[in-house]
Amino acid sequence: MKYGRTFNFSAGPAMMPEPVLEEIRDEMMNYRGSGMCVMEMSHRSPVFQQIIDEAEQDLRDLMGIPDNYKVLFIQGGATLQFSMIPMNLMKNGKAVYIETGAWSKKAIAEAKKVGEVVVAASSKDKNYTYVPDCSDLDIPEDTDYVYICENETIHGVTWNELPNTKGHTLVSDQSSMFLSKPCNVSDYGMIYAGVQKNVGPAGMIVAIIREDLIRDDLKDLPIYLQYSTHAGAGSMYNTPNCWAIYCCGKVFKYLKSIGGLEEMHKRNLDKAKVFYDFLDSSKMFKGTVEPEFRSLMNIPFVTESAELDKEVVAATKAAGYDNLKGHKSVGGLRASIYNAMPKEGVEALVEFLKNFEANYGK
């Protein structure tokens, strides 16, 4: 690759588009005549105000975000949202969660510290290799919201059809699929995503939240943990993650320039097909997720043994394919092929794995 870069299959932080990195490099020492790097400038300056305003508008354009939704840039990562969501949205003290993998499981554990959690469906019975049928969930009338993790980064499971919430607010963690395909924002009360997987550098989440869900009656909740604080201050109640906002803004513009989320989705379908076709034809490697629920972003796979898995990880790393080791909680291997991963990277990895299989033991 250019600049001696590697194909980085990390689940996050992950690759960013090369044209974006080049533009960031060119602006590093003197951002548009300001005489300083974005990392150095005041968040209260007119220059940075323009950066954050453009980032929000470009995201609104990309996703078609309605005017009655706020876009918030909040520090703390998706893990903080596991707590902030129930703290802010549990008006009646009850929420329904769907358990489809490690990240929804963690969100459930945190929400239970705040109020009552009803796990209406789970795929734990088959080690989170599918999404349960959620067309007719048992949802209590006084439920405040229904929560899903729309793409499970660790287990490689994705939702193809949203749950029937029976009129209740839907909240979705889209961290590892954010901006990978078109999304009808009006189907959700809230969408959030840690940006380090499919957009920019670590240290921030983007929250898209319907205005009627932003409460101003949470006086006993620490001020930073209230969505109303961030919404009222334009995501700048305190010093935000200026660098992440700037980098994400560049990615939003890049996605617009290539044809938006429709084009990105086509590319992602194409890349994933290359890898899944290989897995389905291989005798050494096999996918772990039921085909109907396979993620376009995170592809877990295994060999016949943990020892061979380790051999493959070592061999791929030596050949310039980084971060293919599966998550420590599940083992195996995992290829994360987010938006910024070029098709050539997937094709090159597949070719390497084919050769590894053909020559193994010879």
Per-range role (PLM):
Residues 79-146:
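PLP-dependent aminotransferase-like
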Residues 12, 111, 123-178:
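Active-site phosphate-binding strand-loop segment of PLP-dependent enzymes
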Residues 190, 195-276, 290, 359-362:
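Active-site C-terminal subdomain of aminotransferase-like
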Residues 285-316:
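Conserved PLP-binding catalytic core of the aspartate aminotransferase-like
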Residues 5-56:
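A glycine-/small-polar-enriched, mobile loop at the entrance of the PLP active site in fold-type I
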